[in-house]
């Protein structure tokens, strides 16, 4: 006996039922589906179909709104930054690009530094937002905080400025147009 001669026990494997192959087979014509009606047709009904009754998704009102220009914020704790410093993943200056790569946050727009955990490194951290406790801990350790004003995408589209400089320059304020009726 070898592997090529192994077979299942007799009667263990049931034969496939071939339907719709002529009246002599016993499962021809209607193929075991009965006569007419919804169950004999191909395809399926949607699970929300409720017969003639008004379906639930039409009975309930629409609600909510998704803003098209919504910006997402990635939060980073000081304990995490301290761990990166101890591992040698970042140097004396931590930029927004460093945060993006180390947080694995390719789809985040802004970065916020939170003051959770111990922090004893004198480093310069660039981010969009800082919590009060984070600023206190960074300055107590002898470090500095630098606020970035633009997202990485916005900074890459600024003409005439290097990327790092464009990140740190504030956006120009939007001026309101004067109405024609206001004559002064």
From Swiss-Prot:
Region (Disordered), start-end ranges: 1-62
UniProt keyword annotations, A-Z: Ribonucleoprotein, Ribosomal protein, RNA-binding, rRNA-binding
The record ties this protein, via Pfam families, to: Ribosomal_L27A
Which family, according to the similarity comment?
Belongs to the universal ribosomal protein uL15 family.
Q: What does this protein do?
A: Binds to the 23S rRNA.
- How does this protein assemble? Part of the 50S ribosomal subunit.
Q: Which HAMAP family match?
A: Ribosomal_uL15
> What is the designated name of this protein?
Large ribosomal subunit protein uL15
Native organism is: Chlorobaculum parvum (strain DSM 263 / NCIMB 8327)
